[in-house]
Amino acid sequence: MRNPNEIVAEALAAIHGCPDLPSLEQIKAGYLGKSGQLTELLKSLGAMPADARKTAGARINEAKQAVEAALKIRREALQQAELDRQLAAETLDVTLPGRGLGTAGVHPVSRTLARIEALFHSIGFDVATGPEIETDFYNFTALNIPEDHPARAMHDTFYLRQNNAGGGELLRTHTSPVQIRHMQTHEPPLRIIAPGRVYRCDSDVTHTPMFHQIEGLWVDESVSFADLKGVLADFMRNFFERDDLAVRFRPSFFPFTEPSAEMDIGCVMCGGSGCRVCSHTGWLEVLGCGMVHPNVFRHVGVDAERFIGFAFGLGVERLAMLRYGVDDLRLFFENDLRFLKQFN
């Protein structure tokens, strides 16, 4: 049997001269592995006389411990050397100034929404909200929209679930359902605006599948169409900050109002002289409005003989486009910082 001390001396010399961790693992296998030199010595103990086996076994175990201790010390030294090398290669000057954080800004749609809410709040309107997933009753039936109305078609409305009666759940196509819910839980008189996201199956330069809308409602015993015209004309002139802004109302039709009207303003791009934005008419359509239909009041239990009211609805993105001179609605939703930074 080979002398364990000779093997230890040989192993220590190899360990101390080892240049890297992979080589160190090879040295370990050569002395302590399944076929390592010290392991083979242990295997040979079975052939030795019993009286010599105990002494030889103790010497071999001492040799293993010496090699293992040397391996541990050398491994730690090599690991530290590797860490020092990496740190030196990745030196960071902590005195250098850090990267500046970009300045956040309010999105133009959020900015427009807040401006509209503030203007209506200044004349006594409260903000009401409601669910974006609505039922057929609140989105259509309670608003006097007949079953054969085009708005109920699949190509215009996102239906989530339909029942056998033709109703069901859907993504609201306007915020008018908020008015219905509010009238069910609040007694007149009331003045509210209902801002929020609405959804329609439409996408082009001036339409997106999701957009923001604000609908307003004023219900009292003596509200008139003159009140409607005064409120909306005053709002538009304040919104665009133009006291001389021209406005006009054209007859129209909506199932939930009677009479109904479309409101136009003088083109804010060309001052009414005619341009591409207003199709050279000098006018821009901005909202729909009208006196609340008696059937809507009956659906929510409001006395249609005693109370009267007006309602209106406008697109927030539409007004933002006009206020900021944006010609493509989709730009508001592309999150392009080059575009958004212009409004900060």
UniProtKB/Swiss-Prot annotation:
Signal peptide: none annotated. It holds the Pfam family tRNA-synt_2d. Binds 2 magnesium ions per tetramer. It catalyses: tRNA(Phe) + L-phenylalanine + ATP = L-phenylalanyl-tRNA(Phe) + AMP + diphosphate + H(+). It comes from the Bacteria. Coiled coil: none annotated. Its EC number is 6.1.1.20. CDD domains: PheRS_alpha_core (cd00496). GO terms for molecular function: ATP binding; magnesium ion binding; phenylalanine-tRNA ligase activity; tRNA binding. GO terms for cellular component: cytoplasm. InterPro entries: aa-tRNA-synth_II, aa-tRNA-synth_II/BPL/LPL, Phe-tRNA-synth_IIc_asu, Phe-tRNA_ligase_II_N, Phe_tRNA_ligase_alpha1_bac, Phenylalanyl-tRNA_Synthase, tRNA-bd_arm. One of its GO terms (biological process) is phenylalanyl-tRNA aminoacylation. Keywords: Aminoacyl-tRNA synthetase, ATP-binding, Cytoplasm, Ligase, Magnesium, Metal-binding, Nucleotide-binding, Protein biosynthesis. Its cofactor is Mg(2+). Mg(2+) binds at residue 258. The keyword Metal-binding applies. It is found in: Cytoplasm. Belongs to the class-II aminoacyl-tRNA synthetase family. Phe-tRNA synthetase alpha subunit type 1 subfamily. Tetramer of two alpha and two beta subunits. This is Phenylalanine--tRNA ligase alpha subunit. It comes from Thiobacillus denitrificans (strain ATCC 25259 / T1). The lineage of its organism: Bacteria, Pseudomonadati, Pseudomonadota, Betaproteobacteria, Nitrosomonadales.
